[in-house]
Amino acid sequence: MIKFSIRGENIEVTEAIRDYVESKLTKIEKYFAKDQEIDARVNLKVYRERSSKVEVTIPLDSVTLRAEDVSQDMYGSIDLVVDKIERQIRKNKTKIAKKHREKVPTGQVFTTEFEAEEVDEIPEVQVVRTKNVTLKPMDVEEARLQMELLGHDFFIYTDSEDGATNILYRREDGNLGLIEAK
């Protein structure tokens, strides 16, 4: 059973939108065990230029499913995001099946009644370069400047105040995000 948490930013989540989101996401219930409770977090945003962003996050025990879409049509974005989530489920199930052949732990996340569909073969990603870095103590502003000077989308550094390892990264919207390791 899916529990929905639907939130809107710069938009009122009407009953029609809520019903549409729930009806579309309910179709993925067939992929999960009947007794499994699934939390689906849906975030709907509308921007000044009237484009909308739909984000769906479904945290599971072994994996987090997440998809987003930005377009002028919120209902179209909802459809695309649900399709992306479905593809992720199929890929995940296929990868688990390939990795464990006979002993597929599908009951942990996905229902055993669901047959893994073969998806377009994705080339295996390989680590092609290893780089050792010395983390220097600095504040966020200095890390931002270093990241921009290097032309990177992320920068790892040691926080000069608490000594924690932090990762500063550029988000898709152009802003910056900060991951603080504990």
Swiss-Prot record:
Keyword flag Cytoplasm: yes
Alphabetically ordered keywords of this record: Cytoplasm, Translation regulation
BP term (GO), one: negative regulation of translational elongation
Transmembrane segments: none
GO molecular function: ribosomal small subunit binding
Compartments (UniProt record): Cytoplasm
Subcellular location, principal: cytoplasm
Entry-linked SUPFAM superfamilies: Ribosome binding protein Y (YfiA homologue)
Role noted for this protein: Required for dimerization of active 70S ribosomes into 100S ribosomes in stationary phase; 100S ribosomes are translationally inactive and sometimes present during exponential growth.
Protein name: Ribosome hibernation promotion factor
Organism: Streptococcus pyogenes serotype M6 (strain ATCC BAA-946 / MGAS10394)
